[in-house]
């Protein structure tokens, strides 16, 4: 849902003619920092895995952890019982080149199979901003550490790629690094700039491992989110997972 949601917001931006950068001004991708070095997660990190997705979902961030103006968004598959987008849209023309880069921003559980439980939370804010979190809990910390590594391996191969949205419109993607205070047992940060028809969205992303659980927090908007605000959300997300009773 996350990638298709970004594409939908880009379409809305085009319709409303609200570009994040005026003609002649540098786009957000021109200021992307390089990805940081690979971070190794401890395979023996302490922490029992979640085995119930409902319990894991309850440990994700909620409106109280976000800036004022955000509200929950129902997941069409989990909350509304609708079929996956790939099944619902027979005329879907979306594609990614290279194909492996379609994994960028995909839920952790999709990027590394074998999770004992997985969950997602979605929120929408003002001016086309969104915040979402997904988490996957694995049987062992070693499994979680491998998932954390897999995400970084994909990112390293996908610093620049392209594709099309569901309507066949060209989309360009650029990935760069972002700094942030360490969170959990291991963490990384990066930015993804998605551009189509001259309009761009910036996704600030934090991926963290705590115990046997890996979580991904994404804040998307026409401009990068305030660093302090994102740091607070990241540590709130990791803290809730670390302190929640797994079951």
Can you say where each PLM-predicted feature lies in the sequence?
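N-terminal export and membrane-targeting signals
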Residues: 1-10
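C-terminal motif of bacterial Sec signal peptides marking the signal peptidase cleavage site
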Residues: 14-17
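N-terminal "mature-domain start" segment
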Residues: 19, 24-118
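Second-shell loop/turn segments in exported
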Residues: 50-52, 131-139, 220-224
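Extracytoplasmic/secreted envelope proteins and their assembly/folding machinery
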Residues: 53, 57-63, 67, 132-135, ...
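A small/polar (G/S/T-enriched), proline-flanked helix-loop surface module common
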Residues: 73, 77-194, 245-246
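A short, solvent-exposed beta-edge/loop patch
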Residues: 127-129, 171-235, 240
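Flexible helix-coil linker/hinge segments at domain or subdomain boundaries
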Residues: 239-247
